[in-house]
C-alpha cells in the first residue's frame, strides 16, 4: 500500500503535521495521482522550488506560491539588483531541487501569532506583504532544512516524495496583481507521483506549444495585435473575418430556427443604469467609464441591460412568453495586462449572447432546450462536454431565498433529465447561479465556454412585468445564456483543439486552386466562380513561385482542399484534388468536385 501523505477531514485536506490524533475520523490520502494527493504534492514541490532558488540565489525573497490547475507557481524577487531569470535558468533550479529532495528533509509546521511571525520575518519585505493579507490570529509556517516560508499548507511529511517534477516556464507578475507595484519573477511547474504521468504531461505541454492559437493565428493569417492600438484588442484579418462570419451565419440560422429574435443594444450606457442593475457596485472594477456632457457613462461589459430595455419597450402578455432575444454583442472588460493571452483573455470580445424572458413555470423547459442546443453545437465541433452548477458568490445581489429558488431550478432541470454535473460553490455571477458548460479538447484540457444563468434579481430591479391569464401583473424570470461564451475565446480553443485543421464548413479558405502555369489560369478562375455560387471560399495561388512552394503555403495555412490544374485537367474539365483532412489524392470531374464540396458544407447541423 502507498504511503499516507495527508488526510481528508470534513471535506478539507489536512496534512500529517496537523491531524493531531484525529486520524480515526479522517479518510487517508495516499501517495498517488488522485486530485487530493496531487494538491499536496504540488504545494510541497512549490516550496522545494523556492528552497532551491534560495540556495542558488541567497538574496531571493518570496511572495506567494499557490497551486494552479495542473501545477503550481511561485512569485519572488531574485535580489535587490533587479536580476531576472529566464527559461535557460530552469534546468539548474531543477537540478538543485533534485539534490535537496534526496536529502529527505522532514517538513515541519510551526504555528504562532501574527506578531511573532512578523518579528521572525522582519527583514523580509515580501513576507510583510503576505502578513498584511492574513487575518489576525494564528499563523503557520513550514520549514524544510534551512528554508522556511509562511503557508497554510497542506504539505507532504518529507521531501523524499518529490521525485517527478518539471519546471515549465518563467513569467512576470505584479506584486499582489497590482499593476502599480513592482514586477516579480514567476516560475511555473508541475509534479506527479510517478514518472509516466509526468512524461505524459510534458508531452502534452510540447504538443500545446505546437498548437498555440497565437502561433496558428500568424501562420493562418487570422488575427493580429498591435501595441499602438492597445493590449487585449484583437484585429481580425480577412481570413479571420471569414472564419468569424461563417460561424456567425451558422449560429444566426440556428437561433432563428429556435424562435430567437435578433436585437441590438448600445455599447455605451449611462452609469445610472449600471447602478440600477448592480454592476456599478459589484462589477465596476471590470468596466470602463467616461464622462460626456458632465454625465458618467459606462461601456457595457455584458448585454443584459440592453436586452432588458428591449423587453421594456412594449407591454408583455403571458402569451408572448418566452421571449428570446439574441445578439452578437461586443463587450469590454478590464483585464490586467499581465493576464492578457491571445484570444483567450482580451479586453474586447463578442458574445453569442441571449436573454430569455419567461414565466417561472417555463424555466425548466427553456433550460433543457438551451442544453440541447449547446450539445448540438459542441458535438458538431467534436468536443466532449460536462456541466457544473455555480452557486452564490460572496459579492452578490438578492437575498438567499431568491438564490436558493434559482439554484434549485437549475438542479431540478438537470436531475430530472439525467444530466451529471459538479458543483462550484461560490462561482455564480453576482446576479444569479449558473450552469457552466465545460468542454474537453484534444489535449484533455477543460475549457469553460457556454453558460446558463437563472436571474430573479434583475427583473426585480428593473420592475419587469407581464400580464397573466387573470389580467394581473406578474414578474418574469430572466435566463442569461451564451453557447460559445465569446467568439474570440471559442475560436482560440477550436484552433488548438484542431491544431488549425478547422472543419471544412468554417475554414476561412476552403479550397486553394493551384494552376501549374498561366495557361491554366482561366480554368482556375472558372472553378473559383463555380465554388463561389455555392458559398465555398477559394483562392487561386498564381504567384510567380514554384508549384511546390505554392502547395506548401496552402498546407501551412491549413486549407482543407488543394486543387492542382495542368493540361489534362483543363482538357478534361477535371481536377487533381488533395484532400488534406481525408489525407487522400484523387482525380475527378469538376461537377463531382463541386458536389463533394456541397456535401462537406452540409455535414454540419446546428
UniProtKB/Swiss-Prot annotation:
Gene name of the encoded protein: thrS
Name of this protein: Threonine--tRNA ligase
Enzyme Commission number(s) from the entry: 6.1.1.3
Top-level taxon: Bacteria
One BP term from GO: threonyl-tRNA aminoacylation
Free-text remark on how the cofactor is bound: Binds 1 zinc ion per subunit.
Positions of region (Catalytic): 212-503
Record-annotated disulphide pairs: none
Pfam families: HGTP_anticodon (PF03129), tRNA-synt_2b (PF00587), tRNA_SAD (PF07973)
Keyword Nucleotide-binding attached: yes
Subunit structure: Homodimer.
Chain coiled-coil ranges: none
Location of the protein in the cell: Cytoplasm
Cofactor or coenzyme needed: Zn(2+)
Ligand binding (Zn(2+)): 304, 355, 480
Primary role: Catalyzes the attachment of threonine to tRNA(Thr) in a two-step reaction: L-threonine is first activated by ATP to form Thr-AMP and then transferred to the acceptor end of tRNA(Thr). Also edits incorrectly charged L-seryl-tRNA(Thr).
Family stated for the protein in its record: Belongs to the class-II aminoacyl-tRNA synthetase family.
Entry GO CC: cytosol
Keywords: Aminoacyl-tRNA synthetase, ATP-binding, Cytoplasm, Ligase, Metal-binding, Nucleotide-binding, Protein biosynthesis, RNA-binding, tRNA-binding, Zinc
Chief place where the protein resides: cytoplasm
CDD domains (alphabetical): ThrRS_anticodon (cd00860), ThrRS_core (cd00771)
Catalytic reactions of this protein: tRNA(Thr) + L-threonine + ATP = L-threonyl-tRNA(Thr) + AMP + diphosphate + H(+)
Amino acid at each position: 500500500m502507498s504511503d499516507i501523505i495527508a488526510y481528508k477531514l470534513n471535506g478539507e485536506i489536512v496534512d500529517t503535521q496537523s491531524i493531531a490524533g484525529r486520524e480515526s475520523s479522517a479518510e487517508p490520502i495516499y501517495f498517488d495521482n488522485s486530485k487530493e494527493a496531487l494538491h499536496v504534492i504540488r504545494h510541497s514541490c512549490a516550496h522545494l522550488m523556492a528552497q532551491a532558488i534560495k540556495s542558488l540565489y541567497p538574496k531571493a525573497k518570496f511572495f506567494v506560491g499557490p497551486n494552479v490547475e495542473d501545477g503550481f507557481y511561485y512569485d519572488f524577487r531574485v535580489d535587490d539588483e533587479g536580476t531576472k531569470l529566464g527559461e535557460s535558468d530552469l534546468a539548474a533550479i531543477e537540478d538543485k531541487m533534485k539534490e535537496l529532495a534526496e536529502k529527505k528533509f522532514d517538513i515541519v509546521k510551526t504555528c504562532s501569532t501574527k506578531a511573532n511571525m512578523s518579528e521572525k520575518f522582519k527583514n523580509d519585505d515580501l513576507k510583510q506583504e503576505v502578513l498584511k493579507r492574513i487575518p489576525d490570529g494564528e499563523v503557520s509556517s513550514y520549514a524544510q532544512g534551512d528554508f522556511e516560508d509562511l503557508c497554510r499548507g497542506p504539505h507532504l511529511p518529507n521531501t523524499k516524495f518529490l521525485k517527478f517534477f518539471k519546471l515549465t516556464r518563467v513569467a512576470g507578475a505584479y506584486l499582489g496583481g497590482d499593476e502599480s507595484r513592482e514586477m516579480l519573477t514567476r516560475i511555473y511547474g508541475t509534479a506527479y507521483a510517478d514518472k509516466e504521468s509526468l512524461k505524459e504531461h510534458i508531452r502534452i505541454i510540447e504538443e500545446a506549444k505546437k498548437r498555440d492559437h497565437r502561433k496558428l493565428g500568424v501562420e493562418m493569417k487570422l488575427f493580429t495585435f498591435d501595441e499602438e492600438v492597445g493590449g487585449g484588442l484583437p484585429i481580425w484579418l480577412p481570413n479571420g473575418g471569414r472564419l468569424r462570419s461563417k460561424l456567425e451565419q451558422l449560429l444566426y440560422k440556428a437561433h432563428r430556427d429556435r424562435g430567437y429574435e435578433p436585437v441590438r443594444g448600445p455599447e455605451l450606457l449611462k452609469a445610472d443604469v449600471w447602478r440600477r442593475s448592480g454592476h456599478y457596485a459589484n462589477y465596476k472594477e471590470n468596466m470602463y467609464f467616461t464622462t460626456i456632457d458632465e454625465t458618467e457613462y459606462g461601456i457595457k461589459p455584458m448585454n443584459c441591460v440592453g436586452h432588458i430595455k428591449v423587453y421594456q419597450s412594449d407591454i408583455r402578455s403571458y402569451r408572448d412568453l418566452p421571449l428570446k432575444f439574441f445578439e452578437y454583442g461586443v463587450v469590454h472588460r478590464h483585464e490586467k495586462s499581465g493576464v492578457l493571452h491571445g484570444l483567450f483573455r482580451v479586453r474586447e470580445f463578442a458574445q453569442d449572447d441571449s436573454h430569455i424572458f419567461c414565466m417561472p413555470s417555463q424555466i425548466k423547459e427553456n433550460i433543457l432546450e438551451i442544453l440541447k442546443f449547446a450539445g448540438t453545437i459542441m458535438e458538431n465541433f467534436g468536443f466532449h462536454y460536462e456541466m457544473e452548477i455555480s452557486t452564490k458568490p460572496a459579492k452578490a445581489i438578492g437575498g438567499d431565498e431568491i438564490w436558493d429558488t434559482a439554484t434549485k431550478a437549475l438542479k431540478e432541470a438537470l436531475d430530472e433529465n439525467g444530466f451529471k454535473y459538479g458543483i462550484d460553490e461560490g462561482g455564480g455571477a453576482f446576479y444569479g447561479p449558473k450552469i457552466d458548460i465545460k468542454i474537453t479538447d484534444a489535449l484533455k484540457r477543460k475549457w469553460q465556454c457556454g453558460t446558463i444563468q437563472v436571474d430573479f434579481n434583475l427583473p426585480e430591479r428593473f420592475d419587469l412585468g407581464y400580464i397573466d391569464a387573470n389580467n394581473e401583473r406578474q414578474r418574469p424570470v430572466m435566463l442569461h445564456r451564451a453557447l460559445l461564451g465569446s467568439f474570440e475565446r471559442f475560436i482560440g480553443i477550436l484552433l488548438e483543439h484542431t491544431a488549425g485543421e478547422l472543419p471544412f464548413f468554417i475554414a476561412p479558405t476552403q479550397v486553394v486552386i493551384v494552376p501549374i502555369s498561366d495557361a491554366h489560369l482561366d480554368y482556375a478562375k472558372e472553378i473559383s466562380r463555380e465554388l463561389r455560387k455555392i458559398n465555398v471560399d477559394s483562392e487561386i495561388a498564381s504567384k510567380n513561385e514554384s508549384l511546390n512552394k505554392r502547395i506548401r503555403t496552402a498546407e501551412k495555412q491549413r486549407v482543407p482542399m488543394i486543387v492542382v490544374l495542368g493540361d489534362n485537367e483543363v482538357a478534361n474539365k477535371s481536377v487533381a484534388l488533395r484532400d488534406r483532412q481525408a489525407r487522400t489524392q484523387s482525380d475527378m470531374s469538376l461537377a463531382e468536385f463541386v458536389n463533394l464540396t456541397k456535401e462537406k458544407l452540409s455535414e454540419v447541423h446546428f
